[in-house]
């Protein structure tokens, strides 16, 4: 491994975690922003214009490529283009605080639009391009969005005639527009941009003004709109500096779509607040395409999801040998826990540790992480970010001793915590059941050295014969078996044991489903973990249902298996 602690300690932005944790104060970070002097606040100004008005103006801020396009934009380019889009919105009459949604594939226009929306003081709502009509409707309806930016290809999935608040639709890549309706006026992005001035008076906002509305799916009910404010930039900036360890010369690639919170917090805000060169690759995942991208651009810092790393692992190590990946110096993973097996594989094929970290849509930014300058325990999510207090609490809100599984909670008050669940105060209050603590809904334990270990979602933990079993532990063990590409584990009602463990498994290439293999997998878990943790049922499937951000949807498998309603499926991959 080339990124040993000794090798990186001097070069890392945070050379000593323990010292940083002891001395850190969020107030000190405020000095990094221009509003600390001017009092004028706007995320887009800090992320783009601050650099465009400095020696970084000609630095490449965005490298964009897909099957058809290959483009680059400096900070100055993005300043002027987002100014133009801000003017487009202002001319149409869009005001501060209005919800403006984006429903389009990754493209320069998406990023320019998003920055222009923020410059206008409006609240941006990013949607996954793969959403179908019901998912689009739910989010536009709940948010009372007045404006949507989309493409001709995606427009058929927008029930715009049935959304009374939606008055403007801006189509990207389309000069010929559909007929306006009584309520909706169509605009061409290209036509309006040509008319718009490159000078723009930014709408200065309060740090507590709404900035972005990300919808997140629960196991029940409609998706919830999680509101974050401009003040979140304090956390985006500092976590990108210390966890992503972004440095001046870096080419940074976050593979997440902006429809998912990682794609905004760490695909847009974190890197650009730090003045980094950000790479966006359009199109679908393929190991060859991804490795080619790293090689072509000389990517230094790479952030992706466990599913992607497991897929890369499943195609075998030989593929990596065909590409020059030596530019990589720091790899990170987020979205769901990273199995220890994948960390060891990363050390073998990339000679680098893959750094897992933990946060969620509601926290707005990274909360617990593995840091370049800190010893790693593969399979652990790491230690709390400086300025963050995390704890494992029981049902009554008492802190549990090391090694005991309980509720993962975070002391309220960090800069990027959610400020509201849109139109649902009762749901917002449920996140803070114990005075002063945010309850994540995840179960975890903390070991004697202060490292946190994920055990499962509160509603995923299995009670079998009086024992509590975290599904992630069993899944991680299964993935260690050479035949297994991916695994998901659920609890199934059982009259004798309360619940039994059922595993769903997708095999690697070259393996086929047999009774012998199923028994071998059961024994593999029994011998590797414990008898009570061994699955009593194993179902081998071609694929496992996942969200578009790569999380395996255990609740969907459980619903299919037990014949129950599946709940909201809008975030599920095709």
Feature names for model-found ranges:
Residues 58-115, 132-137, 188-191, 230-231:
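Conserved AMP-binding/adenylate-forming core of the ANL superfamily
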Residues 134, 138-141, 148-153, 295, ...:
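AMP-binding/adenylate-forming catalytic core of the ANL superfamily
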Residues 3-12, 112-115, 119-191:
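Structural core segment of the AMP-binding/adenylate-forming
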């Amino acid at each position: 491994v080339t990124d040993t602690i000794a090798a990186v300690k001097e070069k890392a932005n945070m050379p000593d975690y323990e010292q940083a944790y002891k001395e850190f104060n969020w107030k000190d970070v405020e000095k990094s922003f221009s509003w600390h002097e001017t009092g004028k606040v706007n995320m887009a100004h800090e992320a783009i214009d601050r650099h465009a008005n400095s020696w970084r103006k000609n630095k490449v801020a965005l490298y964009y490529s897909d099957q058809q396009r290959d483009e680059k934009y400096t900070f100055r380019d993005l300043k002027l283009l987002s100014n133009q889009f801000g003017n487009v919105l202002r001319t149409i009459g869009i005001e501060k605080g209005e919800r403006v949604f984006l429903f389009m594939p990754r493209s320069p226009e998406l990023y320019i639009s998003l920055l222009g929306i923020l410059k206008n003081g409006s609240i941006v709502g990013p949607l996954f391009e793969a959403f179908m009509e019901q998912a689009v409707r739910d989010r536009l309806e709940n948010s009372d969005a007045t404006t949507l930016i989309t493409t001709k290809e995606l427009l058929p999935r927008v029930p715009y005639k049935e959304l009374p608040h939606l008055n403007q639709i801006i189509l990207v890549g389309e000069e010929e527009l559909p007929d306006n309706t009584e309520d909706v006026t169509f605009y061409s992005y290209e036509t309006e941009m040509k008319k718009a001035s490159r000078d723009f008076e930014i709408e200065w906002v309060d740090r507590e003004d709404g900035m972005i509305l990300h919808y997140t799916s629960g196991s029940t009910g409609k998706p919830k709109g999680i509101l974050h404010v401009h003040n979140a930039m304090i956390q985006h900036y500092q976590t990108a500096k210390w966890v992503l360890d972004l440095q001046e010369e870096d080419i940074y690639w976050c593979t997440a779509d902006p429809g998912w919170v990682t794609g905004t917090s760490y695909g847009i805000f974190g890197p650009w607040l730090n003045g980094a060169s950000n790479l966006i690759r359009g199109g679908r995942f393929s190991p060859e395409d991804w490795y080619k991208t790293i090689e072509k651009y000389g990517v230094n810092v790479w952030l992706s999801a466990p599913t992607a790393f497991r897929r890369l692992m499943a195609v075998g190590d030989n593929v990596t040998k065909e590409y020059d990946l030596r530019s990589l110096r720091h790899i990170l993973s987020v979205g769901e826990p990273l199995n220890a097996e994948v960390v060891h594989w990363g050390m073998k094929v990339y000679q680098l540790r893959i750094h897992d970290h933990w946060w969620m849509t509601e926290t707005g930014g990274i909360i617990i992480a593995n840091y370049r300058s800190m010893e790693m325990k593969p399979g652990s999510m790491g230690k709390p970010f400086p300025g963050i207090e995390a704890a494992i609490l029981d049902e009554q809100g008492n802190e549990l001793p090391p090694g005991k599984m309980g509720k993962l909670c975070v002391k309220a008050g960090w800069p990027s915590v959610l400020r509201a669940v849109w139109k649902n105060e009762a749901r917002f209050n449920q996140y803070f059941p114990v005075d002063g603590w945010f309850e994540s809904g995840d179960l975890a334990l903390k070991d004697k050295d202060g490292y946190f270990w994920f055990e499962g979602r509160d509603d995923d933990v299995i009670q079998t014969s009086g024992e509590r079993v975290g599904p992630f532990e069993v899944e991680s063990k299964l993935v260690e078996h050479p035949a297994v590409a991916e695994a998901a584990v659920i609890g199934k009602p059982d009259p004798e044991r309360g619940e039994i463990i059922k595993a769903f498994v997708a095999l690697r290439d070259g393996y086929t489903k047999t009774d012998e293999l199923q028994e071998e997998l059961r024994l593999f878990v029994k011998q590797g973990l414990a008898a009570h943790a061994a699955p009593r049922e194993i179902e081998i499937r071609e694929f496992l249902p996942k969200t578009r951000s790569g999380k395996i949807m255990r609740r969907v498998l459980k619903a299919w298996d037990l014949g129950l309603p599946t709940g909201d499926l809008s975030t599920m991959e095709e």
